[in-house]
Amino acid sequence: MLKQSVRLILASLLFASPCLPQTAQTHPSTDDSARDQVCLNEILIRTSKSDTPAQVTEAQHKAEGLRKAAKKGRSFANLAKANSQGPAAAQGGDLGCFKRGVLAKKLEELLFHMQPGEVSDVMNTKQGFVILQVTDRNPR
């Protein structure tokens, strides 16, 4: 149930089309690129339309500090558990795995070039500031 919630929230943030990830998984492509997948952890620092500019700046600075901590070797999962406001925070930010073609094209271009353990830049989304970590590529 939690995985479903996480995927629905991610769909609103990151997916190229309104179809759910399950749709992509139940209609596999014969193209070899369809076998590519990336597994992700997330840290979300929420913002809302009602936040003041100072609150948004504070959230951005917090996200940037968390990214720096992760880049310096702190456990991304522990940082997510302690700081993320996303639905997968209790699971260390574990969002699961996503096949190529499910995420927004720009995000895929970034994530499918990252190596396991790499941490993304801070991204500003409708939900707030997001940091992603690739945990695995093409898992079997």
Residue ranges of each PLM-predicted region?
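Well-structured core secondary-structure elements of compact alpha/beta domains
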Residues: 26-71, 85-102, 133-140
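Boundary at the C-terminal end of the N-terminal hydrophobic targeting segment
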Residues: 19-26
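Bacterial N-terminal signal peptides that target proteins for export
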Residues: 1-9
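Cell-wall glycan
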Residues: 34, 41, 106-116
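Bacterial N-terminal signal peptides
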Residues: 8-18
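Surface-exposed patches in mature extracellular/periplasmic domains of secreted proteins
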Residues: 75-82, 120-123
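Charged, alpha-helical scaffolding/interaction elements associated with membrane systems
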Residues: 72-73, 116
